[in-house]
A protein has these predicted regions:
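Secretory targeting signatures
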Residues: 1-40
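Residue-level hotspots at or immediately adjacent to binding/recognition sites across diverse folds
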Residues: 38-265
Length: 265
């Protein structure tokens, strides 16, 4: 009958409308409703440290299993004594960006405009370099006290400075480069490497009084190198007191390792 067909058509129309509305509502819910599994419920194995700052943090150093420092922009220094559960801000006494921190008996920090800070336990002592540019890295082969220590720092425009005998000596004229030097590492008071912009690798065996350029692989000479470490070092009690290998990392995933031994690697 016509009424039956009309009734059947209405049913089909209602069914289509219900299905369409259901899909439309589901789409809206998926679009605007947060995921049922929140980020907090996903265990990534990482927790955010409770440091309240918007400043970039440029370096971090663990002194032992419980104590660590984090440093960064605008002279910010943070310290934890309970394995990162709590962090307290320390007064650095400076507003310059801090770029690197090292420890050899005492924590030492370098930063922009020649900033050098030394931790004496409860506070930071300024030992900055007048006239120096931005300092990017440091190496501390010897530290007994400020008066009895050897510290090397590197920075902009080929700058390398050495602290010894209670004074800073400018070694920049000996580096043979005006490239920024981003990293420096010494295994003792005499032997060290420094790396920087445009594939720069230089080495010294006389405490920085002279530096020799080390050829980097040709394909990496346009890249900047950001860090260097000397490992496998043989100490004075061994037959050959020289670095065994040098590892350098840098731009575009660069990782290169010396294939020779000793300071001529």
């Amino acid at each position: 009958m016509l009424s039956d067909k009309y009734s059947s058509g209405k049913k089909h129309g209602r069914t289509f409308t219900i299905i369409f509305c259901s899909f439309f509502l589901a789409f809206i819910l998926l679009l605007f409703t947060p995921s049922l599994i929140s980020e907090e419920e996903i265990d990534t194995g990482w927790d955010q440290a409770p440091i309240s700052t918007d400043n970039d943090l440029n370096d971090v150093l663990a002194l032992n299993s419980t104590s660590a420092f984090a440093i960064g922009e605008n002279g910010k220094i943070y310290h934890t004594v309970n394995s990162g559960v709590n962090w307290s801000e320390q007064d650095s006494g400076v507003i310059q960006d801090l770029n690197a921190i090292e420890f050899n008996g005492q924590a030492i920090v370098v930063g922009d405009s020649g900033t050098v800070l030394i931790n004496d336990g409860d506070s930071w002592i300024g030992n900055s370099i007048e006239g120096a540019g931005n300092l990017y890295d440091l190496s501390v082969p010897h530290f007994e006290s400020l008066a009895d220590s050897v510290i090397f720092v590197s920075g902009t425009g080929g700058e390398i400075w050495k602290w010894s005998d209670n004074t800073w000596d400018d070694l920049s004229n000996f580096t043979g480069t005006t490239n920024d030097i981003y990293a420096i590492d010494f295994v003792n008071e005499n032997e060290g490497f420094a790396v920087g912009a445009d594939g720069l690798i230089i080495a010294t065996i006389d405490g920085g009084l002279s530096w020799e350029i080390r050829d980097s692989p040709e394909e990496f000479r346009g890249f900047s190198f950001y860090d260097v470490t000397i490992f496998g070092y043989k100490g004075p009690s061994d037959d050959e007191a020289s670095p065994v290998s040098v590892l350098i990392v840098g731009e575009n995933g660069t990782v290169i390792q010396s294939s020779g031994t000793g300071p001529t690697a």
